[in-house]
From Swiss-Prot:
Species annotation: Salmonella heidelberg (strain SL476)
Keyword Ubl conjugation among record annotations: no
Name of the molecule in the record: 5-oxoprolinase subunit A
Similarity comment: family membership: Belongs to the LamB/PxpA family.
Subunit and partners: Forms a complex composed of PxpA, PxpB and PxpC.
Domain of life the protein comes from: Bacteria
GO MF, any single term: 5-oxoprolinase (ATP-hydrolyzing) activity
Keywords per UniProt: ATP-binding, Hydrolase, Nucleotide-binding
Reported function: Catalyzes the cleavage of 5-oxoproline to form L-glutamate coupled to the hydrolysis of ATP to ADP and inorganic phosphate.
Enzyme class name: hydrolase
One Pfam entry name: LamB_YcsF
């Protein structure tokens, strides 16, 4: 069995270089919520050195709150901003002799596109118009995945190791109790359930079906490195191969 393990990088965390030795895919911040041209270049070089698949991590323009502020923007604006960010990272990747493989929206853009077909459509169109061979990563079972499929993009359905789930398969908003899982054992058990059994237990106790093609571990978490190592060990013990 294979699984992709991804992390959001280029957001100013000191653990980025070490995480790149443990994950198979990197989602690199493109300047709208975090990072800049130099951090993008550094992350791209480190990812290439470690053989890690590179993806753009576009966001709403929200550096003050790390892309976690809800915004109401016209779909055309979201299309343009997404295309702009993908292109910026794509130029750096190309200049370093690499190939960009995927796009995964960040933060509130990701969450809103999971439920809003218009936003999902704008993002999927931007990805398709830039390069239809790119993989679109989105929340498992979301509108973003459906929009990608409509544009005939390869999609990858994502689950989260350290986030709480609602009964409908969406993530618990960060403003609500249960949004983040701080207990390492609970996060590990949840991840294995999602990957091996295709199910997740919601914060209300309801089991929900999920398709896990890639697992996100947050690089800004206090125990990100230690958890990544434990997760890799758990996968190895169960003959689950981490591969992009």
């Amino acid at each position: 069995m294979n699984i992709d393990l991804n992390a959001d990088l280029g957001e100013g965390c000191a653990s980025d270089s070490e995480l790149l030795t443990l994950v198979s895919s990197a989602n690199i911040a493109c300047g709208f919520h975090a990072g800049d041209a130099q951090t993008m270049l550094t992350c791209v070089r480190e990812a290439l050195k470690n053989g890690v698949a590179i993806g753009a991590h576009p966001s709403f323009p929200d550096r003050d709150n790390l892309g976690r502020t809800a915004m109401v923007l016209p779909p055309e604006t979201v299309y343009a901003q997404t295309l702009y960010q993908i292109g910026a990272l794509g130029a750096i990747v190309q200049a370093q002799g690499g190939v960009m493989r995927h796009v995964k929206p960040h933060g509130m853009l990701y969450n809103q596109a999971a439920k809003d077909p218009r936003l999902a459509q704008a993002i999927a169109k931007a990805v398709h118009d830039y390069d239809p061979s790119l993989i679109l990563v989105g929340l498992a079972g979301s509108e973003l995945i459906r929009a990608g499929e409509r544009h005939r993009l390869v999609t990858r359905q994502e689950v989260f190791a350290d986030r709480g789930y609602q009964a409908d398969g969406s993530l618990v908003p960060r403003t609500q109790p249960g949004a983040l899982i701080h207990d390492e054992e609970q996060a590990l058990a949840q991840t294995l359930d999602m990957v091996q059994a295709g199910r997740v237990k919601s914060v209300t106790g309801v089991w929900t079906t999920v398709t896990a093609q890639t697992v996100c571990i947050h690089g800004d978490g206090e125990y990100a490195l230690a958890f990544a190592r434990r997760l890799r060990a758990a996968f190895n013990a169960r003959n689950i191969h981490v591969i992009a």
